[in-house]
């Protein structure tokens, strides 16, 4: 009982975060969002092709190279599959804050444990510098090296 009351109290601040699909007021009434606030479509209405500008933009954001026609075709198929969600009738469906909102989830107790196990934990890492984990570089765009001759630095 108290968990349900606590969940209701925490719902109100979360309503501010919804902006694309619907607007939920403090009483839970769903209103359609303004079409101007909808996310832009990758594929224009009535076509099944992704424009070159969108492909270039996605390449910069995701650091993925769509140089082959096969990659662009796969992207277009993925967008067409995702566009099927627009056909789903969601009238009368209450928006979810979490898929687990019908369950009472309990937190574990916060117990202080003995420390001093840094050496043991650092043994799990491939690369350590001054008692810190070193992560590999993420998606860093590298210059295109095709056709370039490496310059010699020793003269």
UniProtKB/Swiss-Prot annotation:
Similarity annotation: Belongs to the GatC family.
UniProt-annotated stretches for the region Disordered: 19-42
- State the species of origin: Rattus norvegicus
GO cellular component, alphabetical, reads: glutamyl-tRNA(Gln) amidotransferase complex; mitochondrion
User: What are the recorded GO MF terms, alphabetically?
Assistant: ATP binding; glutaminyl-tRNA synthase (glutamine-hydrolyzing) activity
Q: Could you tell me the EC number(s) of this protein?
A: 6.3.5.-
- Which GO biological-process labels does this protein carry? glutaminyl-tRNAGln biosynthesis via transamidation; mitochondrial translation; regulation of translational fidelity
Q: What is the protein name given in its UniProt record? A: Glutamyl-tRNA(Gln) amidotransferase subunit C, mitochondrial
The yes or no answer to whether the keyword Hydrolase is present is: no
In Pfam terms, one family for this protein is: GatC
């Amino acid at each position: 009982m108290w968990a349900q009351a606590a969940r209701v109290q925490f719902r109100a601040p979360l309503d501010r975060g919804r902006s694309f699909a619907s607007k939920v007021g403090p009483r839970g009434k769903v209103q359609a969002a303004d079409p101007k606030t909808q996310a832009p479509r990758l594929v224009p209405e009535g076509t099944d092709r992704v424009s070159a500008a969108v492909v270039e933009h996605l390449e910069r954001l995701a650091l993925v190279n769509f140089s082959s026609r096969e990659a662009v075709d796969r992207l277009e198929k993925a967008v067409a599959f995702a566009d099927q969600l627009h056909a789903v009738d969601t009238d009368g469906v209450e928006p979810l804050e979490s898929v687990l909102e019908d369950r009472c989830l309990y937190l574990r107790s916060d117990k202080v444990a003995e420390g001093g196990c840094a050496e043991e934990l650092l043994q799990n890492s491939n690369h350590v510098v001054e008692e810190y984990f070193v992560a590999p570089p993420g998606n860093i765009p590298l210059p295109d090296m095709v056709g370039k001759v490496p310059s010699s630095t020793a003269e």
